[in-house]
Amino acid sequence: MYNSASGGHIWEIGGTEAGRLTASGWVDSKGPVRSVPATEPGNTNYTLQPSDAGKYIDSQGTGNTVTIPQNTMSKGDVVTIVRATSGDVTIAQGIGVTMYHSADGANTTTGNRILAQRGMATLIFVGPNYCYISGAGLS
């Protein structure tokens, strides 16, 4: 094991060494590994950005819309939307985007969704313009 201090503290382990490494936290390119960072658009409509992958959207405005635009997310990206206050929020599939609601079992139901107050929905992208949505308080 060695510490390559030239590019920050990068630890590499090889061979058959045994021991313990104590760290105060783990961070990767998207942020802290043991917590989910938030995007907080406030009381306004919001359009997903590539930087939202691995985050949750804290939607607070009554009657607001979170839009999924075409060619924004990548295969494997996950975004969760939380409706933390009263009222509904619309989750809108943008032009050229197909959003399947997993609840029907056949995965044939597409279209905009409504997330009720205190609801939570997760989107997983299987391509830049295709995603599946599932959650509580989702219709």
Model-found features: residue ranges?
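Right-handed beta-helix
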Residues: 1-16, 28, 98-103
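Tight coil/turn sites that cap or link beta-strands
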Residues: 6, 71, 94-96, 116-120
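C-terminal trimerization/auto-chaperone modules of long, extracellular attachment fibers and adhesins
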Residues: 10-22, 47, 67-69
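Exposed extracellular interaction/assembly regions and N-terminal maturation sites
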Residues: 27-95, 128-139
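Terminal beta-strand-rich extracellular "head" domains
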Residues: 95-115
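Extracellular jelly-roll beta-sandwich "head" domains, especially the C-terminal globular C1q domain
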Residues: 108-139
